Protein backbone atom coordinates (compact mmCIF):
# COMPACT_ATOMS: atom_id res chain seq x y z
CA UNK A 1 0.00 0.00 0.00
CA UNK A 2 1.05 3.62 -0.51
CA UNK A 3 1.55 6.08 2.34
CA UNK A 4 -1.76 7.73 1.44
CA UNK A 5 -3.48 4.41 2.11
CA UNK A 6 -1.87 3.73 5.44
CA UNK A 7 1.14 3.62 7.74
CA UNK A 8 3.32 0.61 8.52
CA UNK A 9 4.50 0.20 12.10
CA UNK A 10 6.81 -2.54 13.38
CA UNK A 11 4.06 -4.88 14.53
CA UNK A 12 0.96 -3.67 12.68
CA UNK A 13 -0.34 -1.71 9.70
CA UNK A 14 -2.83 1.16 10.03
CA UNK A 15 -4.97 1.74 6.96
CA UNK A 16 -6.38 5.27 6.89
CA UNK A 17 -7.62 5.68 3.32
CA UNK A 18 -11.28 5.62 4.44
CA UNK A 19 -10.77 7.81 7.50
CA UNK A 20 -10.81 11.62 7.49
CA UNK A 21 -8.18 11.89 10.19
CA UNK A 22 -4.94 10.16 9.21
CA UNK A 23 -2.19 8.64 11.34
CA UNK A 24 -0.54 11.57 13.12
CA UNK A 25 2.03 12.33 15.78
CA UNK A 26 -0.60 13.23 18.40
CA UNK A 27 -2.07 9.75 18.34
CA UNK A 28 1.35 8.10 18.34
CA UNK A 29 2.44 10.14 21.37
CA UNK A 30 -0.72 9.32 23.31
CA UNK A 31 -0.40 5.63 22.49
CA UNK A 32 3.24 5.60 23.57
CA UNK A 33 2.97 7.75 26.72
CA UNK A 34 -0.32 6.68 28.35
CA UNK A 35 0.34 4.95 31.67
CA UNK A 36 -0.58 1.27 31.24
CA UNK A 37 0.64 0.02 34.62
CA UNK A 38 -1.99 -2.13 36.38
CA UNK A 39 -4.54 -1.38 33.65
CA UNK A 40 -6.71 -4.34 32.65
CA UNK A 41 -9.66 -2.58 31.01
CA UNK A 42 -8.82 0.29 28.62
CA UNK A 43 -11.13 2.53 26.57
CA UNK A 44 -10.14 4.74 23.60
CA UNK A 45 -12.71 7.48 22.91
CA UNK A 46 -12.97 8.75 19.33
CA UNK A 47 -10.60 6.05 18.14
CA UNK A 48 -10.49 7.11 14.46
CA UNK A 49 -8.32 4.52 12.71
CA UNK A 50 -7.89 2.55 15.92
CA UNK A 51 -4.22 3.54 16.13
CA UNK A 52 -4.08 4.38 19.85
CA UNK A 53 -6.09 1.29 20.81
CA UNK A 54 -3.76 -0.97 18.83
CA UNK A 55 -0.64 0.70 20.26
CA UNK A 56 -1.97 0.10 23.76
CA UNK A 57 -2.69 -3.51 22.86
CA UNK A 58 0.94 -3.91 21.76
CA UNK A 59 2.18 -2.42 25.03
CA UNK A 60 0.03 -4.61 27.28
CA UNK A 61 -0.22 -8.36 27.88
CA UNK A 62 -2.94 -10.88 27.16
CA UNK A 63 -4.79 -9.99 30.38
CA UNK A 64 -5.67 -6.50 29.14
CA UNK A 65 -8.77 -5.81 27.05
CA UNK A 66 -9.07 -2.65 24.94
CA UNK A 67 -12.38 -1.15 23.84
CA UNK A 68 -12.63 1.67 21.29
CA UNK A 69 -15.54 3.99 20.45
CA UNK A 70 -16.01 5.87 17.16
CA UNK A 71 -18.99 7.80 15.79
CA UNK A 72 -18.14 8.46 12.13
CA UNK A 73 -19.17 5.41 10.03
CA UNK A 74 -16.15 5.32 7.71
CA UNK A 75 -13.70 5.71 10.58
CA UNK A 76 -15.55 3.04 12.55
CA UNK A 77 -15.27 0.56 9.68
CA UNK A 78 -11.59 1.43 9.22
CA UNK A 79 -10.91 0.91 12.93
CA UNK A 80 -12.68 -2.46 12.85
CA UNK A 81 -10.57 -3.46 9.83
CA UNK A 82 -7.30 -2.35 11.44
CA UNK A 83 -8.04 -4.05 14.74
CA UNK A 84 -9.15 -7.26 13.04
CA UNK A 85 -5.97 -7.36 10.95
CA UNK A 86 -3.65 -6.78 13.91
CA UNK A 87 -1.96 -9.48 15.95
CA UNK A 88 -3.95 -8.27 18.97
CA UNK A 89 -7.44 -8.71 17.50
CA UNK A 90 -8.60 -11.02 20.30
CA UNK A 91 -8.12 -8.19 22.83
CA UNK A 92 -9.63 -5.35 20.78
CA UNK A 93 -13.31 -4.45 20.41
CA UNK A 94 -14.59 -1.45 18.43
CA UNK A 95 -18.03 0.08 19.04
CA UNK A 96 -19.91 2.68 17.00
CA UNK A 97 -21.62 5.54 18.79
CA UNK A 98 -21.46 9.06 20.19
CA UNK A 99 -19.30 9.53 23.27
CA UNK A 100 -22.05 11.49 25.03
CA UNK A 101 -24.83 9.00 24.24
CA UNK A 102 -23.12 5.64 24.53
CA UNK A 103 -23.64 3.29 27.48
CA UNK A 104 -20.87 1.00 28.68
CA UNK A 105 -21.87 -1.44 31.39
CA UNK A 106 -18.40 -1.67 32.87
CA UNK A 107 -15.68 0.47 34.38
CA UNK A 108 -12.28 1.15 32.83
CA UNK A 109 -8.87 1.45 34.45
CA UNK A 110 -7.60 3.74 31.71
CA UNK A 111 -9.55 5.97 29.32
CA UNK A 112 -7.61 7.74 26.56
CA UNK A 113 -8.60 10.14 23.81
CA UNK A 114 -7.19 12.30 21.04
CA UNK A 115 -10.48 14.22 20.88
CA UNK A 116 -11.86 16.80 18.44
CA UNK A 117 -10.36 20.25 18.86
CA UNK A 118 -11.33 22.46 15.92
CA UNK A 119 -13.95 25.08 16.72
CA UNK A 120 -17.11 25.30 14.65
CA UNK A 121 -15.76 28.43 12.96
CA UNK A 122 -12.96 26.42 11.35
CA UNK A 123 -15.12 24.72 8.76
CA UNK A 124 -13.41 22.07 6.68
CA UNK A 125 -14.03 20.69 3.23
CA UNK A 126 -15.82 17.46 4.01
CA UNK A 127 -18.55 16.34 6.37
CA UNK A 128 -16.39 13.53 7.71
CA UNK A 129 -13.53 15.84 8.59
CA UNK A 130 -15.92 18.24 10.29
CA UNK A 131 -17.29 15.31 12.26
CA UNK A 132 -13.80 14.22 13.18
CA UNK A 133 -12.50 17.57 14.36
CA UNK A 134 -15.27 20.16 14.87
CA UNK A 135 -15.68 20.34 18.62
CA UNK A 136 -19.40 20.93 18.84
CA UNK A 137 -19.13 19.03 22.10
CA UNK A 138 -16.63 20.42 24.55
CA UNK A 139 -13.61 18.63 25.94
CA UNK A 140 -15.18 19.03 29.37
CA UNK A 141 -18.25 17.14 28.11
CA UNK A 142 -15.99 14.27 27.05
CA UNK A 143 -14.08 14.35 30.33
CA UNK A 144 -17.25 14.23 32.42
CA UNK A 145 -18.59 11.36 30.33
CA UNK A 146 -15.30 9.49 30.72
CA UNK A 147 -15.55 10.01 34.47
CA UNK A 148 -18.80 7.98 34.49
CA UNK A 149 -16.94 4.97 33.08
CA UNK A 150 -13.81 5.35 35.22
CA UNK A 151 -12.84 2.74 37.80
CA UNK A 152 -12.15 4.03 41.31
CA UNK A 153 -8.38 3.94 40.85
CA UNK A 154 -8.52 4.67 37.11
CA UNK A 155 -7.00 7.41 34.99
CA UNK A 156 -8.16 9.53 32.03
CA UNK A 157 -5.56 10.85 29.55
CA UNK A 158 -6.26 13.32 26.72
CA UNK A 159 -3.86 14.84 24.20
CA UNK A 160 -4.87 18.39 23.26
CA UNK A 161 -3.52 21.66 21.88
CA UNK A 162 -1.74 23.48 24.70
CA UNK A 163 -4.36 26.18 25.31
CA UNK A 164 -7.23 23.68 25.18
CA UNK A 165 -5.43 21.47 27.70
CA UNK A 166 -4.87 24.39 30.07
CA UNK A 167 -8.56 25.27 29.81
CA UNK A 168 -9.60 21.69 30.54
CA UNK A 169 -7.36 21.51 33.60
CA UNK A 170 -9.00 24.69 34.90
CA UNK A 171 -12.51 23.40 34.15
CA UNK A 172 -11.83 20.03 35.77
CA UNK A 173 -11.46 21.62 39.19
CA UNK A 174 -15.24 21.67 39.60
CA UNK A 175 -15.72 18.07 38.42
CA UNK A 176 -14.32 16.11 41.38
CA UNK A 177 -11.41 15.05 39.18
CA UNK A 178 -7.78 15.88 39.87
CA UNK A 179 -5.11 16.58 37.27
CA UNK A 180 -2.44 14.02 38.08
CA UNK A 181 -0.02 14.20 35.14
CA UNK A 182 1.01 16.83 32.59
CA UNK A 183 3.34 16.14 29.67
CA UNK A 184 4.15 19.21 27.59
CA UNK A 185 4.95 18.34 23.97
CA UNK A 186 7.55 20.59 22.33
CA UNK A 187 7.94 20.09 18.59
CA UNK A 188 11.46 21.54 18.36
CA UNK A 189 14.07 22.43 20.95
CA UNK A 190 13.74 26.07 21.95
CA UNK A 191 10.10 26.40 20.92
CA UNK A 192 7.07 26.72 23.17
CA UNK A 193 4.95 23.65 23.83
CA UNK A 194 2.08 23.27 21.35
CA UNK A 195 0.49 20.08 22.68
CA UNK A 196 -0.10 18.62 26.09
CA UNK A 197 -1.07 15.22 27.42
CA UNK A 198 -3.16 15.76 30.55
CA UNK A 199 -4.24 12.99 32.89
CA UNK A 200 -7.01 13.02 35.49
CA UNK A 201 -8.04 10.78 38.37
CA UNK A 202 -10.60 10.72 41.16
CA UNK A 203 -7.62 10.32 43.50
CA UNK A 204 -5.91 13.45 44.80
CA UNK A 205 -2.28 12.50 44.25
CA UNK A 206 0.76 14.76 43.69
CA UNK A 207 0.96 16.22 40.18
CA UNK A 208 3.66 14.77 37.90
CA UNK A 209 4.98 17.17 35.23
CA UNK A 210 7.36 16.47 32.36
CA UNK A 211 8.33 17.73 28.92
CA UNK A 212 9.01 15.86 25.70
CA UNK A 213 10.97 17.48 22.86
CA UNK A 214 10.50 15.77 19.48
CA UNK A 215 13.25 17.43 17.39
CA UNK A 216 16.56 18.88 18.53
CA UNK A 217 18.10 22.09 17.18
CA UNK A 218 19.44 20.17 14.15
CA UNK A 219 15.98 18.84 13.24
CA UNK A 220 16.91 15.33 14.35
CA UNK A 221 14.72 13.23 16.61
CA UNK A 222 15.74 13.60 20.25
CA UNK A 223 16.94 10.55 22.14
CA UNK A 224 13.88 10.78 24.39
CA UNK A 225 11.51 10.65 21.41
CA UNK A 226 13.44 7.76 19.85
CA UNK A 227 13.31 5.75 23.06
CA UNK A 228 9.59 6.45 23.40
CA UNK A 229 8.66 5.36 19.87
CA UNK A 230 11.29 2.76 18.96
CA UNK A 231 8.87 -0.11 19.61
CA UNK A 232 6.58 1.30 16.91
CA UNK A 233 8.46 3.18 14.18
CA UNK A 234 10.13 0.97 11.57
CA UNK A 235 13.37 2.93 11.30
CA UNK A 236 13.72 4.17 14.85
From Swiss-Prot:
It holds the Pfam family MTS. Disulfide bonds: none annotated. One of its GO terms (cellular component) is cytoplasm. Its EC number is 2.1.1.223. CDD domains: AdoMet_MTases (cd02440). PROSITE patterns: N6_MTASE (PS00092). GO terms for biological process: methylation; tRNA processing. One of its GO terms (molecular function) is nucleic acid binding. It catalyses: adenosine(37) in tRNA1(Val) + S-adenosyl-L-methionine = N(6)-methyladenosine(37) in tRNA1(Val) + S-adenosyl-L-homocysteine + H(+). InterPro entries: DNA_methylase_N6_adenine_CS, SAM-dependent_MTases_sf, Small_mtfrase_dom, tRNA_Adenine-N(6)_MTase, tRNA_adenine-N6_MeTrfase. Keywords: Cytoplasm, Methyltransferase, S-adenosyl-L-methionine, Transferase, tRNA processing. It is found in: Cytoplasm. The keyword Transferase applies. HAMAP family: tRNA_methyltr_YfiC (MF_01872). Belongs to the methyltransferase superfamily. tRNA (adenine-N(6)-)-methyltransferase family. Specifically methylates the adenine in position 37 of tRNA(1)(Val) (anticodon cmo5UAC). This is tRNA1(Val) (adenine(37)-N6)-methyltransferase. It comes from Actinobacillus pleuropneumoniae serotype 5b (strain L20).
Amino acid sequence: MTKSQGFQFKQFFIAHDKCAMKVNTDGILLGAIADIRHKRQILDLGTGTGLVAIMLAQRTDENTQISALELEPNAYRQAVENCRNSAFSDRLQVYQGDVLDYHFHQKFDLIVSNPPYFSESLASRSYERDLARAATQSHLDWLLQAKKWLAEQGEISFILPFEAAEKLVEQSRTSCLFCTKICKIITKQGQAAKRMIVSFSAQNVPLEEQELVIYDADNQYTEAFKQLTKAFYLNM
